[in-house]
């Protein structure tokens, strides 16, 4: 402790030369190094990343750190070649499908004297925020040094999601290439220099492609963004004031707007861009084509009448698709008023934006089910049809008893109900009111009786339907046999007439030969 408590007064008061305490950076450095370091003064140590070390060396080495005693590699400025390589890497990562080199369609040449960028008013941060993007900062600094840029103002709108960085440049008289890239790669404008221009004329800028791609980015701040800022960040609005153009562009003379689209865009993107442009111009009308949806179905009675009017045609509708007047089946009465009922009509119409009218009309007619029954009177195919319009009615049968709600006294059940209760293993209730279990069991066996009646009715109708089909088949077979006989007779008659015709022609030809 005495060594640390003591001061260095004795050393400083000694007669040592002050120059000898200073270390020379040039010729005295070799005294501090080992012999192996004298041979190679720049020692480079390579080590893996910590993440690679944690993966037990299974993954390839992504980056190697370089430590040098003579220079700091990370602080060196990027050369123009390395900057160009970084820019190409940015293009490959941000636009893997379309590269600026291959996307040559839709190229437009614009004089920068008449090019002005107007950006919507947003919360701009100072130019010091530009340092947060190293690649953008380096490229802008390189452009400033190489081209002598007179004025470059960088504004970065700060949104809650932090998903966009916009660079606004006032382009004046300079002729060197400029590459401006957004931080989120949402838009890319690459400009090239035309070397054949004279020094006093501004260089032309060729816009290879301008693509906008909205992607969700990780938020920079914990505070949520306001709706207005999100709306402004989702759209990159560029207003181009163009006085002279050297190629054809697509204009919309009605609204005096400019629409720039690539040739590979679909019709949906074109309509969306037009709608967005109209919203920017303050128009709320949407471009929608006139659309009408109409669904109509005719009743089964018309088709059955048409089939009966002719001797043969489509057979009758199966009874399984027609409800019964004395059975419920599987279709509840509420289904009759469904939107796709036989007599339902649905009409939806959307008018033009100019008219400003839109109407939706849904109309339904009262649901009615028709039943058609026909019987054959003779073998010639004459038939009569009768159409009866009925509605669904619940099953009322003497096999099922009914008690008014809240009644008391002795419970009277039918023989069918008692037999079904015993068959199912339920006790027969005797008094009212019923318990929960008795009500449940009674409902179950009554439903079973109704299902049995409905099944019997459907089997009866199916049998009648099959009998009608069999009779119609017999009639059609008989008619077909008669027609075949008539056809054979007509063929024989035709053959006889042809033979007579040939004979007459031969006689006429002989008579003409004799006259000649």
UniProtKB/Swiss-Prot annotation:
Residues 469-476 are annotated as: Leucine-zipper. GO terms for molecular function: cAMP response element binding; chromatin binding; cis-regulatory region sequence-specific DNA binding; DNA binding; DNA-binding transcription factor activity; DNA-binding transcription factor activity, RNA polymerase II-specific; sequence-specific DNA binding. The modification Phosphoserine is found at residues 75, 79, 82. SMART domains: BRLZ. In all cell types examined, including developing salivary gland in embryos and in adults, brain and optic lobe cell bodies, salivary gland, midgut epithelial cells of the cardia, female ovarian columnar follicle cells and male seminal vesicle, ejaculatory duct, and ejaculatory bulb. Coiled coil: none annotated. CDD domains: bZIP_CREB3. GO terms for cellular component: chromatin; mitochondrial nucleoid; nucleolus; nucleus; transcription regulator complex. InterPro entries: bZIP (IPR004827), bZIP_sf (IPR046347). Residues 443-463 are annotated as: Basic motif. Residues 441-504 form the bZIP domain. GO terms for biological process: chitin-based larval cuticle pattern formation; dorsal/ventral pattern formation; larval chitin-based cuticle development; positive regulation of DNA-templated transcription; positive regulation of transcription by RNA polymerase II; regulation of mitochondrial transcription; regulation of transcription by RNA polymerase II; salivary gland development. The keyword Disulfide bond does not apply. Belongs to the bZIP family. Transcriptional activator. Binds to fat body-specific enhancers of alcohol dehydrogenase (ADH) and yolk protein genes. BBF-2 may play a role in fat body gene expression. It binds the consensus sequence 5'-T[AC]NACGTAN[TG]C-3'. This is Cyclic AMP response element-binding protein A. It comes from Drosophila melanogaster (Fruit fly). The lineage of its organism: Eukaryota, Metazoa, Ecdysozoa, Arthropoda, Hexapoda. The gene is CrebA.
